[in-house]
C-alpha cells in the first residue's frame, strides 16, 4: 500500500471532535428568567476560561502628553495604566463643532497592522483624512460624526511590542505570538489582557467631564473586533458593541482557518460557540458587519451565527437591539450600517 492512497486529512480528526461536542452552556433558555440565569453562568465560566479578571481596578495614573489641533477635531495623546507595569497608549479625539456638552463616546480598537495609527490616519508620521486600508480610519470617521473617540493601542502592536519588533523597522510586525504563548504558560490569555486594557480605557473615560457615561460604545475590526466582542460580553458599562470582520462561528473561523494565536481561549468550545457569547451582550446593543469575500471569517458562517444571536436577543425581548450588515468587500471595515445604527442607539 502506498501512502498516497491513505487519507491523511488532519482536519477530519478535529472536525469530528467538534461534531461530537456537547457544549455545557449552549443557549437553551425557554423564557427570560432562564435566559438571565444562563447569562450569569456563562459569564462566570468565560471569566474563568480567559484567566480571570482583577477584582480591583488598577490606579490609572493617567497623563495627557500632547494636544494637537486638526481643524475639525483635537487629538490628545494619552497614557494610563491597566495593570502593574502595563501602560496603555491612546489617542482621544474630540469634535470641535460641539461645545459645552457631554458626548457619546466610541472606544475604537484596531486589528492587526501598525497599531492605533491605522484608525487615526497616521502614516509615515503624517496624519491623513482619506479612508483607505482595511481600517478606513474609522476613529476619524467617528469623530467627524460627533462622537468623542478613545482609540487605544492593543498590547502587542505598534508602540506596545517587544524590543526586537520595535527594532525591526517593520511597523506591521506584531508580538502577538510570543505574548499570547506567554499568557498561556501563565494560565491566562491575550484576550484577558486586552479586555483588561479596554476596561481600563472605560475607567479612564469615567474620569472625564466631557463623556456621557450612559452612551458608551465600542467598535473594533478583526483582532479589534475580538477585543470589542469579549469586552462587551464582560463589561456592562458598554451600551453598544460594533463588531466588524470577526463575528462568525469558532468552528468556521479560528477552528478551521489559520489565525493569530491571540484569538484563542483554551476550552471555550466545551461550553459555548461564538453566538452564545453574543448573548452575554443582550439586551444591550450589538451590531455586526461582515464582508462577502472575507477569507478568514467566512460570510456564510457569519450569517448562521447572526441567526443564532438574533434568536437569543429575541429571548430577551431585545430583538431591536441587534442588527447587522453584509457588504461587498474583503476583510475590511465598512461602517455604513454601523454608524446609522449607532445614531439611533446612542
Annotate each language-model stretch with its function:
Residues 1-74, 82:
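N-terminal targeting or regulatory segments adjacent to alpha/beta-hydrolase or S9 domains
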Residues 67-127:
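Glycine-rich active-site/cofactor-binding loop and its immediate structural neighborhood
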Residues 101, 108-196, 206-207, 252-257:
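Cap/lid segment of the alpha/beta-hydrolase catalytic domain
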Residues 178, 182-185, 200, 239-278, ...:
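Mobile cap/lid helix-loop segments that gate and shape the active-site cleft of serine hydrolases
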Residues 210-222:
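Alpha/beta-hydrolase fold nucleophile elbow
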Residues 281, 288-290:
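Short beta-strand/loop motif that positions the catalytic acidic residue
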Residues 292-297, 332-333:
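Acidic catalytic loop of the alpha/beta-hydrolase fold
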Residues 307-346:
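C-terminal catalytic histidine-bearing segment of alpha/beta-hydrolase fold enzymes
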Amino acid at each position: 500500500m502506498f501512502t498516497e492512497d491513505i487519507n491523511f486529512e488532519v482536519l477530519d480528526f478535529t472536525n469530528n471532535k467538534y461534531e461530537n461536542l456537547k457544549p455545557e452552556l449552549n443557549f437553551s433558555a425557554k423564557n427570560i428568567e432562564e435566559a438571565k440565569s444562563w447569562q450569569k453562568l456563562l459569564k462566570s465560566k468565560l471569566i474563568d476560561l480567559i484567566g480571570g479578571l482583577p477584582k480591583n481596578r488598577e490606579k490609572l495614573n493617567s497623563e495627557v502628553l500632547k494636544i494637537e489641533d486638526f481643524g475639525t477635531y483635537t487629538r490628545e495623546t494619552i497614557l494610563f495604566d491597566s495593570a502593574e507595569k502595563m501602560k496603555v497608549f491612546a489617542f482621544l479625539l474630540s469634535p470641535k463643532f460641539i461645545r459645552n456638552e457631554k458626548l457619546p463616546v466610541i472606544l475604537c480598537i484596531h486589528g492587526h497592522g501598525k497599531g492605533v495609527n491605522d484608525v487615526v490616519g497616521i502614516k509615515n508620521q503624517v496624519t491623513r483624512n482619506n479612508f483607505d486600508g482595511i481600517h478606513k480610519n474609522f476613529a476619524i470617521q467617528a469623530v467627524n460624526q460627533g462622537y468623542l473617540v478613545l482609540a487605544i493601542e492593543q498590547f502587542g502592536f505598534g508602540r506596545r511590542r517587544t524590543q526586537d519588533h520595535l527594532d525591526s523597522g517593520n511597523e506591521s510586525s506584531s508580538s502577538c505570538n510570543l505574548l499570547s504563548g506567554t499568557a498561556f504558560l501563565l494560565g491566562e490569555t491575550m484576550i484577558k489582557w486586552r479586555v483588561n486594557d479596554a476596561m481600563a480605557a472605560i475607567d479612564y473615560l469615567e474620569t472625564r467631564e466631557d463623556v456621557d457615561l450612559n452612551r458608551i460604545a465600542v467598535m473594533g475590526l478583526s483582532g479589534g473586533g475580538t477585543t470589542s466582542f469579549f469586552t462587551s460580553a464582560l463589561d456592562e458599562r458598554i451600551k453598544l458593541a460594533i463588531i466588524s470582520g470577526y463575528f462568525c462561528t469558532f468552528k468556521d473561523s479560528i477552528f478551521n482557518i489559520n489565525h493569530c494565536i491571540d484569538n484563542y481561549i483554551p476550552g471555550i468550545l466545551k461550553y459555548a460557540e461564538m453566538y452564545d457569547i453574543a448573548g452575554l451582550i443582550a439586551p444591550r446593543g450589538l451590531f455586526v458587519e461582515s464582508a462577502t469575500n472575507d477569507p478568514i471569517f467566512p460570510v456564510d458562517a457569519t450569517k448562521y451565527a447572526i441567526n443564532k444571536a438574533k434568536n437569543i436577543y429575541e429571548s430577551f425581548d431585545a430583538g431591536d437591539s441587534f442588527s447587522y450588515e453584509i457588504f461587498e468587500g474583503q476583510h475590511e471595515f465598512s461602517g455604513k450600517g454601523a454608524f446609522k445604527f449607532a445614531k439611533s442607539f446612542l
